Amino acid sequence: MMIPGHFDYHRPKSV
């Protein structure tokens, strides 16, 4: 499962 939103909350790569 690769969700570009589920993992974003877990690992903020944008920050």
Swiss-Prot record:
Its EC number is 1.2.5.3. The keyword Cell inner membrane does not apply. Binds 1 FAD per subunit. Its cofactor is FAD. It comes from the Bacteria. It is an enzyme of class 1 (oxidoreductase). GO terms for molecular function: carbon-monoxide oxygenase activity. It catalyses: CO + a quinone + H2O = a quinol + CO2. Keywords: FAD, Flavoprotein, Oxidoreductase. Coiled coil: none annotated. Catalyzes the oxidation of carbon monoxide to carbon dioxide. Heterotrimer consisting of a large, a medium and a small subunit. This is Carbon monoxide dehydrogenase medium chain. It comes from Pseudomonas carboxydohydrogena (Seliberia carboxydohydrogena).
